[in-house]
Amino acid sequence: MSGGSSRRYPPELRERAVRMVAEIRGQHDSEWAAISEIARLLGVAARRRCVSGCARRRSMPAHGPGPRPKNPLR
């Protein structure tokens, strides 16, 4: 996260959101669908960059189980 985005929401809310995504991930086709649902429930904006960074810092796989596929466009 860069700039003021890390202060947009309190740490407790971000931690709660990460836990909630982990809890419902299996109920959705993708992690992004779970993230979007939790963001809607909490009334916040879902931003891939921010959410992925929070997940990595908490050692939660941001891409689900298994190895992350390589992006051929990079």
Swiss-Prot record:
Superkingdom, taxonomy of origin: Bacteria
Xref: InterPro entries: WH-like_DNA-bd_sf
Keyword tags: Transposable element
Protein name listed in UniProt: Insertion element IS986 uncharacterized 8.2 kDa protein
Source organism of the structure: Mycobacterium tuberculosis
Lineage: Bacteria, Bacillati, Actinomycetota, Actinomycetes, Mycobacteriales
